[in-house]
A protein has these predicted regions:
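Long, acidic, intrinsically disordered low-complexity segments
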Residues: 1-9, 417
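A general alpha-helix detector
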Residues: 2, 48-54, 90, 108
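Basic, short loop/linker segments at the boundary and entry of helix-turn-helix/winged-helix-like folds
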Residues: 7-54, 59
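Helical catalytic core of nucleic-acid polymerases
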Residues: 24-28, 34-41, 46, 70-83, ...
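Anion-binding and metal-coordination hotspots
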Residues: 60-73, 84-479
């Protein structure tokens, strides 16, 4: 059979193969050279394996076994392999090993995209999406259970080693596979034990009754709430996307269930892996807080986000107060530094609470005895308030960066900039899940989950790049 006739001249698999040939694969060849001379199978060409995975993800294939099967009959895979089979173990190992090589690969592609003016870093979006880990909620155990499992696993390792030293009852390959499986389980249990200890120390200061639990299958996975309202072991994948053509510039799997602390980390990764910081970054309200605003200002990055007040009128209404008795409705005298309640009483300054990130909370309270005899007490006091209760309000003194941020976000120009967020950021998430089927990781562990997400985003970038070269609308071409 003539292999060249398997695919048309303009087939995307040819473009992927041509691109892989332009990349510097030194990192992968160095890894191969490091194990040359050792027993084992001949190593498959990294260019072929890279091309296979990029082509597979572009077609929604994330299983190494399925990709190995496709190499037997799918024309694009057959063309790449030259009608030769590729082991699913080779494919699986290549995907989750050599993170330095994959990072270098991603950086080279970003360099090519930047050289063509497709990535400018003038404006990027940051958004996170929850992707299910390769673990079940039933695998989460406490310290006592993990300790018992770990003890049994270590004993099994000892017995297998003794058996190997004496006389193997099983065939050599089966015996080696059995020992390897037991060692891997022991390693996961040791990681689960470390994670349980870390969580217990981290949370016991806030909750004395907290009982730490970790997965014995993927210890780094945390239970998170997903978009369907359920809770499953997951990773929170943070994606930074350039808004000019919707190309991904950075991706990272994290163990934080919320995005609150992720903006600073994303900026650090951009500077480290891309070599420069974006001029502007756009993120939703989950990222918008004093720490993020301060971090962006310190990095010299213009931040656009949706500020969510931590003290809302609805929270006051839940206490049974009418609108006139909400603290934000109290007039404030900046010169004399006091608030006036609906009864006309002055709430004087009583204390200053120093918060993190330069935030100071000023506390104002009514004089003693005033609230107990006030005719408006029933409208002002929460249900069940004690007789000595006094009304208090707070005033937040924000850092200059936060004040400037809030003023900027009130402008029409800033709102138009922020409106780009959902169109750019959420499309990437949809492509990862719907086109690639990445609703659950195949690999275990945060680092390997990051690598799997990187392969997906690399394939996504190439799909859009090829579409732009053909003059197609990038969004339409990717669907």
């Amino acid at each position: 059979m003539d292999v060249e006739k398997l695919v048309d001249e303009d087939h995307c698999v040819r473009a992927i193969w041509e691109l892989a040939g332009r990349l510097d694969l030194r990192r992968y060849h160095e890894q191969i050279a490091a194990v040359e001379g050792s027993a084992g199978r001949e190593h498959t060409d990294p260019r072929l394996l890279i091309s296979l995975w990029l082509y597979a993800y572009s077609r929604g294939i994330s299983s190494a076994r399925e990709l190995a099967r496709q190499c037997e009959y799918e024309p694009g895979c057959q063309w790449l392999c030259g009608l030769q089979p590729v082991s699913h173990r080779t494919l699986s190992g290549f995907r989750s090993e050599n993170k330095a090589g994959l990072d270098d690969l991603f950086a080279q592609v970003l360099g090519m995209l930047s050289a063509e003016g497709l990535i400018t870093l003038e404006r990027v979006t940051l958004d996170g999406t929850k992707i299910k880990a390769n673990a079940s909620g039933n695998t989460f155990r406490g310290r006592e259970k993990i300790a018992a499992y770990l003890k049994a696993a270590r004993e099994q390792v000892r017995l297998l080693n003794e058996e190997a030293e004496n006389e193997e009852r099983l065939a050599p390959r089966r015996a080696a596979a059995r020992r390897r499986a037991v060692r891997q389980r022991t390693s996961r249990l040791e990681a689960a034990w470390r994670e349980v200890e870390r969580l217990q120390q981290e949370k016991q200061h806030d909750r004395k009754d907290f009982v730490a639990r970790a997965s014995t299958t993927d210890p780094e996975a945390h239970v998170m709430r997903n978009g369907e309202g359920g809770t499953v072991p997951s990773y929170n994948v943070q994606v930074v996307t350039d808004t000019k053509h919707g190309l991904v510039v950075n991706v990272e799997a994290t163990t934080d269930a919320i995005d609150y602390r992720q903006l600073d980390a994303a900026l650090e990764r951009c500077e480290e892996k891309v070599g420069q910081l974006p001029q502007q970054i756009v993120a939703d309200g989950d990222y918008t807080n004093h720490a993020s605003v301060q971090s962006a200002a310190e990095h010299g990055v213009d931040f656009y986000g949706s500020w969510q007040n931590s003290w809302k009128a609805s929270e006051q209404d839940a206490l049974g107060r009418k609108a006139a008795f909400v603290s934000t409705a109290f007039p404030y005298d900046a010169e004399q530094d006091y608030f006036v309640c609906p009864a006309g009483e002055k709430l004087q300054h009583r204390a200053v609470l120093n918060r993190r990130h330069g935030v100071r909370t000023h506390v104002y309270r009514a004089p003693k005895g005033v609230c107990s005899a006030c005719p408006l007490r029933d409208d002002c006091a929460p249900p069940g308030a004690k007789p000595e209760w006094r009304r208090s309000v707070t005033r937040i003194e924000e850092p200059g960066a936060t004040t400037a941020f809030k003023a900027k976000m009130k402008t029409e120009e800033a709102q138009q900039t922020y409106a780009q967020r959902s169109r750019v950021a959420e499309f990437v998430h949809a492509w990862m899940k719907e086109r690639c089927g990445l609703r659950q990781f195949r690999c275990r562990g945060r680092v390997k989950a990051t690598m799997e997400a990187t392969w997906v985003c690399l394939s996504y970038n190439l799909t859009r790049w090829f579409a732009l070269r053909r003059g197609l609308h990038p969004t339409a071409a990717s669907l």
